[in-house]
UniProtKB/Swiss-Prot annotation:
Top-level enzyme category: transferase
Entry keywords, A to Z: Kinase, Nucleotide-binding, Serine/threonine-protein kinase, Transferase
Catalysis: reaction(s): [pyruvate, water dikinase] + ADP = [pyruvate, water dikinase]-phosphate + AMP + H(+); [pyruvate, water dikinase]-phosphate + phosphate + H(+) = [pyruvate, water dikinase] + diphosphate
Coiled coil start-end: none
UniProt: ADP binding residues: G150, V151, S152, R153, C154, G155, K156, T157
Organism: Shewanella piezotolerans (strain WP3 / JCM 13877)
Segments crossing the lipid bilayer: none
The name this protein goes by in its record: Putative phosphoenolpyruvate synthase regulatory protein
The keyword tRNA-binding is assigned to this record: no
Length: 270
């Protein structure tokens, strides 16, 4: 039986999940996880406590409870359960209060809530990424913070959306297709924004596997076509002095981090 894990918060529970995943990923085990957001009342907290206690009775093992709860009275109810508590916020707040010489002023939903102009900036960045995905339009490239380039299925769209959602970066992306390969060059709209260009590449074998799952036994997915496209695009990156990273076997989080590290783009945290 898998060890039970609870991610609990009086907000979205995103912080608790991220913290918990980071810790649990250090162990080569699988877990049975349950996320419970918006535990904003004592009544809800008592219900969650009952779930945790029932789990302990059923399994005979104390559940792992990762939480980021602002309200002390709700936090105390979770503390009184049979779970093993890992309190992300309170672990660090008290030492910081001492160092900063002032008490914390807890507020619900401050971390991932709709509280200020930064929220609107994030929505604007997400809308921009969707409107400028896959070369749909070249009219607004001058408004981009970043323009990702690459062959089809190398990770441009998920990387653009992740950068916009997590960091408020206006990321457009442009694909190089089979039709471009005979005379591969940058379109004028990209040339005018060359300082914003960043390339993605991928191992041809992995690209072949991805394309096969989408359009099997086609020219588009053939090993020969994949090798040719990757080779031509990488040669163009080098010719035009466009920085690029290899996305093979990397998660979208890792790809985004590599891009940010290479470009020194400012992260807009929310």
């Amino acid at each position: 039986m898998l060890r039970k894990v609870f991610y609990i918060s009086d907000g979205t529970a995103i912080t608790a999940e991220v913290f918990g995943h980071a810790v649990l990923s250090q162990f080569p085990l699988e877990f049975d996880a349950l996320t419970i957001p918006f535990v904003e009342t004592e009544k809800k907290a008592e219900a969650v406590k009952a779930q945790i206690n029932d789990c302990f009775i059923t399994t005979g093992e104390r559940p792992l409870v990762f939480h980021s709860i602002v309200k002390a009275e709700i936090r105390d109810i979770i503390y009184s359960s049979e779970g093993l508590d890992y309190d992300f916020l309170n672990t660090f707040v008290a030492p910081l209060e001492k160092q900063l010489g002032m008490p914390a002023t807890p507020a619900l939903h401050r971390t991932h809530g709709k509280t200020n102009d930064s929220y609107e900036a994030r929505i604007e960045a997400i809308n921009y990424a969707m409107e400028n995905d896959d070369g749909q339009t070249m009219k607004h490239m001058d408004k981009a913070d970043l323009i990702l380039l690459g062959v089809s299925r190398c990770g441009k769209t998920p990387s653009s959306l992740y950068l916009s959602m997590q960091f408020g970066i206006k990321a457009a992306n442009y694909p190089f297709t089979e039709d471009d390969m005979d005379n591969l060059k940058l379109p004028d709209a990209l040339k005018r924004n060359k300082d914003k260009l960043f390339g993605l590449t991928i191992d041809p074998v992995r690209l072949h596997e991805i394309r096969q799952s989408r359009m099997s036994n086609s020219r588009y997915s053939s090993m020969r076509q994949c090798r040719m496209e990757v080779k031509e695009v990488e040669m163009m990156y080098k010719r035009e002095r466009i920085p690029f990273v290899n996305t093979t076997n990397h998660s979208v989080e890792e790809i985004a981090t590599k891009i940010l590290e290479a470009t020194s783009l400012e992260r807009h945290m929310f």
